[in-house]
Regions:
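Conserved alpha-helical scaffold segments that buttress catalytic/binding sites
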Residues: 1-188
């Protein structure tokens, strides 16, 4: 029996320079994704759309950390109850919350592997990023490098570098490649 597909929207563009991506989850939901999955025989439900609080953040880092904390809790609960979390963002900083939650739920089973299919490495840290955009940092955070508030989510390091590989990378900065090489991450 297939796992139930449990969709979580993350309407957050705080990690990107262009915040328009925050409209993505609402557009995907309005397109009828859930009903189309159900018509194909899948058990599917849209649980919620996580949004940054309207006020109270001094900067985008605080907003992203809050959103990722809530997303990690939701992803962990979905996996713990036998579901398959499908996260629709927003900017790519949502990968931090997604995989922190999944890793936390599966930690007792052993190391988690990740195949990162992306044109970008997303392995910047606050010290190496030319843009300052958090959506360029999720893989580094998942490997324990970056802002301490983000790396500590979900109990610390989510991934061990020997179980991570990147596919499809075509655009990156030398500092990202250096970090991943130092960690032993495979890049194809």
């Amino acid at each position: 029996l297939a796992k139930p597909v449990e969709i979580v929207g993350v309407a957050c563009g705080e990690g990107a320079r262009n915040k328009g991506c925050e409209a993505g989850p609402d557009a995907v939901r309005a397109s009828g994704l859930v009903s189309r999955l159900q018509m194909r025989g899948l058990s599917a439900a849209w649980h919620e759309t996580i949004r940054p609080a309207q006020a109270g953040y001094d900067d985008s880092l605080q907003a992203v950390e809050s959103v990722c904390r809530r997303l990690a809790q939701r992803a962990r609960a979905i996996v713990a109850h036998g579901g398959l979390p499908v996260v629709i963002g927003g900017d790519h900083s949502c990968a931090i919350g997604t995989w922190k939650g999944v890793a936390c739920a599966l930690r007792a089973r052993g190391p988690l592997g990740l195949i990162w299919i992306d044109a970008h490495m997303d392995a910047h840290t606050p010290q190496t990023t030319p843009s300052g955009a958090l959506h360029g940092m999720p893989l580094a955070c998942l490997l324990g490098h970056g802002d301490s508030g983000l790396t500590a989510l979900g109990g610390g390091i989510a991934l061990q570098s020997q179980y991570v590989c990147l596919i499809g990378v075509r655009s990156f900065e030398t500092s990202e490649a250096a970090l991943l090489r130092q960690l032993g991450v495979r890049i194809y």
